[in-house]
Regions:
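Catalytic cores of alpha/beta
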Residues: 101-114, 191-195, 220-223, 243-249, ...
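Conserved N-terminal beta1-alpha1 strand-loop-helix module at the mouth
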Residues: 1-48
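Flexible, glycine-rich active-site loops centered on histidine and acidic residues
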Residues: 102-149
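Active-site pocket-lining/capping segments in soluble small-molecule metabolic enzymes
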Residues: 125, 138-171, 176-185, 192, ...
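Active-site mouth loops of central-metabolism enzymes
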Residues: 14-32, 90-103, 173-191, 267-281
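Glycine-rich, proline-tolerant flexible connector loops at the mouths of alpha/beta enzymes
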Residues: 41-74, 128-139, 204-220, 303-305
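Conserved, mostly hydrophobic/aromatic
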Residues: 18, 46, 112, 199, ...
Length: 317
């Protein structure tokens, strides 16, 4: 069943979360333990992130350096299959423009098709660490709309080179990202919503938001996208606040605001455990208000926050 159908057919606000593939050279057991911690809350689906390759430089000892490419977290497709097979939970691998050519993406789609994994989250992805602005790979999609169009062509039975796909399979369905506080590269919110609508017109069936800590921004964003004629589910993305250092790290990394009330209370905390408890309580209140307003699902970003999410879920699910 597709993600959008899972959301529609649950009799309560759906629960889902995102995980990262293990670091290269490590095992999957830690990831399984995280899922085991949260599986009792009946996740409707689990997202698996994808990570682009980065350039690294190795000193050769003669004053010269050798450049090579390294993916620190490979294995998204395999992890998605492993989770699905072990837990019988729908998995949603992320598909990126960033770091991938159209041919690379096509091979990923073929692998997923063989595994009967047909739900995707379609994203542009972050720029490389050495870049000041995003640069697509050679013969790679420049933004999520182009990536969605490639997936549409694949669903219609056409490879990147124009040759036909001779086998008919279940078509991919996909969601996209959206930003209640605007994508950092968008000149204004209206332009950001314009591109979201284009992705919906291309075939996106739902959108998951960037994390936020002020529900008013989510509600205002939903009003704006509805006014623009966008009627797909807008799923709030949530991550419990955990550390005082996040007062600066979160705005810098995710380009979102921390509400003054939360910031002031966090500064009063004298221990990490106290700060973590504050974040859990804040998240519980956020989720209760979102559920009261009838959100279709709540999607949790679990990295470094599994135990906090468990405490939140115990109250709201």
């Amino acid at each position: 069943m597709k993600v959008v159908d899972l959301i529609k057919h649950t009799n309560k606000t759906a629960f889902s979360f995102e995980v990262l593939p293990p670091l290269k050279g490590t095992g999957i057991e830690k990831l399984y333990r995280s899922i085991d911690t949260l599986r009792d809350f009946d996740p409707q689906y689990i997202n698996i992130t994808t990570h682009r390759s980065e350039y690294v430089y190795k000193e050769l000892g003669n004053g010269l350096f050798e450049r090579s490419r390294l993916r620190r977290r490979p294995g998204t497709v395999a992890v998605a299959a492993a989770i699905h097979n072990k837990y019988n939970i729908t998995t949603v691998p992320h598909i990126l423009c960033s770091g991938f050519s159209r041919e690379d993406i096509e091979y990923v789609l073929l692998d997923l098709q063989f595994l009967n994994i047909t739900d995707l989250l379609v994203l542009r992805g972050d720029k490389a660490k050495h870049e000041s602005t995003f640069t697509p790979e050679e013969n790679g999609p420049a933004h999520a709309l182009e990536l969605a169009e490639q997936i549409n062509d694949f669903n219609r039975g056409v490879f990147v080179d124009g040759s036909p796909i001779k086998v008919t399979n279940t078509p991919f369905s996909y969601g996209v990202a959206c930003y209640p506080e605007k994508h950092e590269e968008a000149p204004n919110m209206e332009q950001d919503i314009y591109w979201l609508k284009k992705k919906v017109e291309a075939g996106a069936e739902y959108a998951v938001t960037q994390l936020f800590y002020d529900n008013r921004k989510y509600f205002q964003f939903v009003e704006k996208v509805r006014a623009a004629g966008i009627n797909i589910p807008i799923i709030p993305g949530i991550k419990p606040f955990r550390k005082q250092s996040q007062l600066s790290v979160i705005p810098k990394t995710f380009k979102v605001d921390i509400p003054q009330e939360l910031a002031l209370e966090a500064l009063k905390c004298t221990t990490e455990k106290e700060t973590e408890r504050l974040g859990i309580e804040w998240c519980i209140q956020q989720c209760k208000e979102l559920i009261k307003h009838g959100v279709p699902s709540i999607h949790f970003y679990s990295v470094g926050a599994v135990e906090s999410i468990k405490e939140v879920a115990k109250v709201i699910y």
